[in-house]
Structure formats: C-alpha cells, structure tokens
Amino acid sequence: MGAFEYLSVLISIILALGMTRVLAGIGEMLQARSRHRIYWVHVIWIVNLFLYLVIAWWIFYRWRDQQPWNFYLFLFVLISPTILYLASLLLFPRESDSDTAVDYKTHYYANHRAFFVLFALFVPVDIVDSLLKGVPHFLSLGPIYFLSGILYFSGLITAAVTRNERYHEFYAIFFLIQTTIVSFLIFQTLV
C-alpha cells in the first residue's frame, strides 16, 4: 500500500461520515414525514451538500501523484472533508431529537449562519489545495474555476448574513446549477 492509498482511507472515512449523516437525515425525514414540516430550500441544500461530498471524494484522487507526503500537508488536506462533515451535522437536528416534531424551515434558519460560514471556508481551502497540487494544475482549471470560486464565496457569505427568504430560495437553486455546470466542465474526468 502506497502513501496515497494509506492516507486516502481517513479522507474517505470522513467524507463517508458526512454522506452517512446526509443519507440518515433523509431517512429520518422520510420515516417521520407526518411529524416533520419539510422546507424545500433545506431539501435543495441537502442535495447540494451531498453532491459536494461526492465531488470532494472524486477530486481527492488528483492527489495520487503527490510525493513526498508530510504530516502538515496531510493535516491541510483533512480540512476540506472535515468542513463538509461538520456542515452535514448542521443540516439536520440531532438524532436524539428525531422523535419530536421538526420544522425544517425553523431548523434551517436557526443554523444557516454556521452552515454557510463553514461552507464558505471550503472555497479558500480549495484554492490553496489546488495551488498545492502545482501551478500548472491550478492554471489548468481555467477561468471557470476562478469565477466560480468568487461566486461561491460571495454567495455563501451572503447566505450566512441574511435571513431573506427570497435570497435563500434563489441561492439554493443557483448553487445547485452552478455546481452541476462547474462539475461537468472541470471535474468531469477522474484524472
């Protein structure tokens, strides 16, 4: 087993914990749908986060040629999956609260600041991550990557500071469309 394979185990576990929390949260919503008031914006953010967890796992493979690995680089690489895992925890009430009625709109707005600040932190971490893979790799991502980073960061910070429902409705859809397009254009292939 090489260094990349060894280190990717922990990265995969953290990402899998985030995916598990999202899928378990969806299951809890479905099982107790008569006691839960679903909020469609919250549902779109569930999809957005799950998509991001999958993309993070997908693009981690681009670290496969990194030599040598050191502890500090590995700690840095752990930041992105950790951010996404923590965001997955904020999307859903604690499992111990799942037996009580949940209004997901109330839950969403009670946690939106922390959720979006965490998600916004992903952007500069991803930029540094891309730079650490080398300047040629960073430049190969092209202007779409840079523009999307600006749009992600500004949109997420705005979502963190505003409770304006129309903005949250718009941005949930915009984020999903943007992520789908950027993923198709930049991260379509594994290598």
Explain the meaning of each model-derived region:
Residues E28-V41, R64-W69, D97-Y108, A160-Y171:
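Membrane-interface helix-boundary motifs at transmembrane edges
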Residues I44, H168-T180:
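Central hydrophobic cores of alpha-helical transmembrane segments
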Residues K133, V182-V191:
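Juxtamembrane boundary at the C-terminal end of a transmembrane helix
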Residues W40-W63:
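A generic, lipid-embedded transmembrane alpha helix
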